[in-house]
Amino acid sequence: MCLFFASGIDIEIGDYSGIGINAHIPNGTIIGDYVMMGPNCFILDENHDISDTTRPMCQQGMTEKKITRIGNDVWIGREVHMTPGRTIADGSVIAMRSVLTKDYPPYSIVGGNPAKLIRYRK
């Protein structure tokens, strides 16, 4: 199994949680209990700063780091990408290859790029 941790010293992974191969998980990420994360998922904790239009983007550095929190009993499909600071609520299902750009209520089923609410678990 191959996991990529940004230094890998400050990540919380709950009981009975599984992480697929090639997951990119930055420091500070909090993963709850009973989480299923598919392979090749990518969690961002920062982004390129592009706010100053008078300077090239490559010279603006990075935005402030934000922590991602994944609740309990969550299923994250393969190749899901999460923008910085996402909170995935308890009981949520994230369809494969989705791009999460915002947070959703508990027991949401979301999918797409950008991810949209499909329905709630019954």
Where are these regions (language model features)?
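Beta-rich strand-turn-strand
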Residues: 78-93, 98-102
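Residues that flank catalytic or metal-binding motifs in active/ligand-binding sites
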Residues: 39, 96, 106
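Hydrophobic alpha-helical packing residues
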Residues: 94, 110-112
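Flexible, glycine/small-residue-enriched loop-and-beta-strand segment within the central core
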Residues: 2-13, 18-87, 113-114, 119-122
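Conserved functional loop/turn residues at catalytic and ligand-binding sites
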Residues: 102-103, 114
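Walker A (P-loop) ATP-phosphate-binding motif of ABC ATPase nucleotide-binding domains
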Residues: 16, 91, 107
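Glycine-centered loop/turn positions within well-structured domains
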Residues: 106-108, 116
